[in-house]
């Protein structure tokens, strides 16, 4: 739990530093320097680049969480299935549950790419960047946590095969927070 909390704090700090650095870049320079730089060459930082970085981070972070969750579920499933191969179907469902966060992160990334206006400015890019972060960060953490819940449910199913439905329910409860983050990101993008 402490490792996940530390990871969340580090990710939040990175997102905050990234966002503030772009805000400072867009607003904090002296007017003469900005006018002089604009006359010489265009800024390498555009709204499109910022939005696309947010989309990429969302898909990457949620994908990492899902990959890790499915991986630890797979390791536990392999151990249980080696002793009781008849449980493979039930174990596969439990192992696959943490994979949904990666799908949600990909969905938000595609939504950012489709909804970002052509020629959007830095402020619009930051808005889309920030809008993609709830799903990216929560997808990472909830994918890992759902994988841990799936491991416990897999072990429970190995000992009591009739309890797999209860294990699915317990594992699916973690999904609630990924769905809330998905909704938050979608609302921040479209509104």
Model-derived features: positions:
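Hydrophobic, small-residue-rich transmembrane alpha-helices and their short perimembrane loops
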Residues: 3-15, 19-191
């Amino acid at each position: 739990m402490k490792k996940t909390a530390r990871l969340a704090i580090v990710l939040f700090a990175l997102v905050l530093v990234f966002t503030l650095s772009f805000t400072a870049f867009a607003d904090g320079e002296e007017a003469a320097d900005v006018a002089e730089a604009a006359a010489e060459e265009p800024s390498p930082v555009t709204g499109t680049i910022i939005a696309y970085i947010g989309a990429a981070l969302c898909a990457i972070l949620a994908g990492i969480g899902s990959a890790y969750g499915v991986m630890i579920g797979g390791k536990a499933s392999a151990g249980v299935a080696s002793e009781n191969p008849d449980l493979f179907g039930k174990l596969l469902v439990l192992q696959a549950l943490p994979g949904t966060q990666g799908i949600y992160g990909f969905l938000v990334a595609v939504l950012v790419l489709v909804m970002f206006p052509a020629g959007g400015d830095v402020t619009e890019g930051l808005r889309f960047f920030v809008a993609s972060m709830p799903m990216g960060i929560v997808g990472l953490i909830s994918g890992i946590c759902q994988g841990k819940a799936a491991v416990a449910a897999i072990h429970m199913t190995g000992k009591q095969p009739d309890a797999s439905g209860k294990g699915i329910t317990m594992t699916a409860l973690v999904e609630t927070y990924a769905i809330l983050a998905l909704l938050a990101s979608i609302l921040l993008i479209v509104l």
